[in-house]
Amino acid sequence: DYMGWMDF
């Protein structure tokens, strides 16, 4: 999670 997105 990066600032509420980017879940890799």
UniProtKB/Swiss-Prot annotation:
Belongs to the gastrin/cholecystokinin family. The keyword Cell cycle does not apply. The modification Phenylalanine amide is found at residue 8. The keyword Secreted applies. Coiled coil: none annotated. Its main location: secreted. This peptide hormone induces gall bladder contraction and the release of pancreatic enzymes in the gut. Its function in the brain is not clear. Binding to CCK-A receptors stimulates amylase release from the pancreas, binding to CCK-B receptors stimulates gastric acid secretion. The gene is CCK. It comes from Macropus giganteus. The lineage of its organism: Eukaryota, Metazoa, Chordata, Craniata, Vertebrata. This is Cholecystokinin.
